[in-house]
């Protein structure tokens, strides 16, 4: 039984057509989220070309022998999309996880123009561009964006062609968790720019999922505590916006601490 199936949907009014060639949505079959995907797509058309990747999952299809838990299955799905996008000769692509929730603000022309301008400046660099996350540490990139040094959530990210090429050159068995090499940068397998928009334009609820059950217990406890503190396990706002403010304050405090330590050593 084939583990994957791509279903293509065509629109003619994609919001981010100037920045991305296609959107991919990772959907684990029979997880109850298909109707949610279609509801989102009935209101939001991120690009003219949208693919839904139907993933049967490692338990119901034959995949590589080391793919034996949810995080590895998700990595395999991302890589399947990277390969498909390269075969189609796409440049930048947006990948959404099937619990994504767009903000109405993504339709506002000022945000669309800001994103298009940034993606154009990034050109052919190896980068990811984050439309929404729970940021932890960030530093200013320009007036509309931040360098996201550490963040939570890879549910709505634009991936450059060069980034796809570089990731596909890594031995898949060495990629244990998608968040670890992108959001937390664990292992530093490759160097790339990770830029985030200054406000969240796409959300997800942070709940206890099959994927999170495989996290390190210490990391999971911290993440779930922070999610509950922000109340983003129940509703996306105002928790997401508050996390952007908290991250800004935390980053300033950390920067001031580092500067003070440097000054003391002079």
Predicted regions: what they are:
Residues 1-96, 100-266:
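An acidic/histidine-cluster motif and surrounding catalytic segment
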